[in-house]
Design a protein with these regions (language model features):
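Terminal, regulation- and interaction-focused segments at domain boundaries
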Residues: 26-36
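Short, solvent-exposed recognition patches
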Residues: 35-97
Length: 130
């Protein structure tokens, strides 16, 4: 193999490696970040691999939430307008016996797979029950 062909092969291999590195997904924010709307949170949950084909919005929203909704009986999503309202919801969730709640900067999700959500959305998992 001549030097030109060898150099071209090395360049192609280097470009391939660079493309792989550039396509890696950035980790989610440690604090879970914020979502501008319940629809944006819903899309993030879907992108994490949890099926929620039909988000049913609560009218009016849950007590402390700016917006809230559910997907069936095992998934509940909510966004909050302030830290105070978010904290009030977490305090209530502790007494209501929720097993685990995913918590971000302005959102919560109750689901059957809190660790998957934490891995994809960031934030923390608050364990409140058995």
């Amino acid at each position: 193999m001549n030097r030109w062909a060898l150099g071209a092969a090395a360049a192609v291999a280097a470009c391939s490696l660079a493309a792989c590195a550039a396509s890696e997904v950035a980790p989610p924010p440690a604090d879970g970040g914020t979502y501008e709307s319940i629809e944006a949170l819903w899309q993030a949950v879907e992108n994490a691999g949890l099926r929620c084909p039909d988000l049913v919005l609560d009218k009016p929203p849950a007590k402390f939430a700016a917006s809230s909704g559910s997907c069936g009986e095992f998934m509940f999503l909510a966004t909050y307008s302030s830290d105070t309202y978010l904290q009030s919801q977490l305090d209530f969730g502790r007494t209501a016996g929720q097993k685990a709640i995913n918590v971000g900067k302005n959102w919560t999700v109750v689901s059957e797979d809190p660790e998957r959500l934490r891995k994809h959305l960031g934030g923390t998992v608050l364990h409140t029950g058995p």
